[in-house]
Structure formats: C-alpha cells, structure tokens
Amino acid sequence: RYQPSKKELSVIWRNTNHFIDTYITHTKPVHSYREFLFCAQKGKYDAYVVGSDQCWRPCYNSFLSSMFLDFTERKNVKRLSYAASFGTDKWEFTPQQTDVCATLLQKFDLVTVREDSGVSLCNEHLGVMAIHVLDPTMLLRKEDYISLINVEKEPKSSGTLFNYILDPDPKKTSYILKVAEAKGLKPFQVLPKCQAENRTRKDVKTRIEDCVFPGVTTWLRAFMDADMVIVDSFHGMVFSIIFNK
C-alpha cells in the first residue's frame, strides 16, 4: 500500500486539520519523549490530563510511558486521567511496561477511566483505584454538536441510512443493503471515494481529491440527518445515542 508524502497527507487530511485548527488548542505534533519533555518545559503547565480513546493500549501506542506522563516525573504538578481507555478488558502490558506504568500512575492525583473493565485493570495490575466516567464525547449535548454543524454551514446529508463501519466485510454490506430495502431508506457513508486501505500510488497522484476525508461536521451531520444508523464501533454507538437514533 502506498504511503502518501507529507504534502499529500496535508491534502488528504485538510478537512480534519481545519476542524482541529479552528476548534482545538494544540501543540505541534509530538513524536518522542524528548519532544514531550520540551513541550512541558516550554508550556510551564500547572496540570496534565491524559485521555481517552485507547490511549493506554500498548499495540496502538509507541510511547506508552508518556501516556502515563513520564515527562512530568520531576515536576510539582497535578496529574490526572480523564476517561482513559485500555481498549480491551484483557491485560496487554508486558511485565516491564506494567512496572513502569504502575509507578507512574501511582503519582497521579486522580485516575478516571472509560470502561468498568478499566477500573478492574487499574486495581489489579497498576495498584490504583480508578473511577468510571463518561466518554468525553458525551459531556456535550446534542445541541452543542448541532451548533458546530451550523457554524460550518454543513449541507444536508446524501441519504437516510447512515452506515459508519470501521471493519467492513461482505456480511455487513449485505446486511446494510437488506435493511435499506426493507425500510425504504437510501444508504450512505461519510468516507473518501478512494478509501485508505485500497488506495494506490496512482490514485494519490492522479485523483487525490477522491482521497480527501470528509470533514468532522459532515460526519456529525450524517448522524443528525439519518433516519437510521448502522455502526460497528464504540463512538458510532455513542453518537447514535447522542442524536437519538
């Protein structure tokens, strides 16, 4: 599979980057312990909060100890986690990772996690009592998300049956089509015409606009407009609940 250049990625992710730059205060991307340390020294922050979606899952995180705020070890600051997630109810840390992260987490002022299973994992493996809290996406009301959609002047969605499928397969596709036919709905997705897992070098070089991911508010509007939603992921379920689908 072709890996686009930095310049090509800036085009492919332009809608996502627009949302981040407009609505989220952020640093430059950080790729190492040294960069985390530099950011901390430059920012002179009073508190650090880590979270949320699978931030404590080793297979998804190449600098796991930094997700336990190792770069603040010598600082007199507040350390908290909000809705941190292990992404699984099984313990995936190596013995060494467990020792390092337990020592770091025990220095936190407050530990909250996204799942009940996370409470158990923290207690059993890291020696910390954690609190189960809401996913941060559920801290906002439906009206807050609709306000974003309106600010961006997002046009109406192209269908009535929104399918947000992260792991597509023929069985899921068949099910979506059957539901659409039975309910008289028009299925639609919010994805690039040329999806990442299938795109080639030729696709990126000759039709890069087809590789561009739709905007965040396009995705939010899909939940708002749809008469019915079919999803296979946690956040798909969450936004279905938020928009009463």
Placement of each model-derived feature along the sequence:
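Structural loop-to-beta junction motif characteristic of Rossmann-like glycosyltransferase folds
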Residues: 244-245
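A short beta-strand/loop micro-motif in the catalytic core of glycosyltransferases
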Residues: 108-115, 230
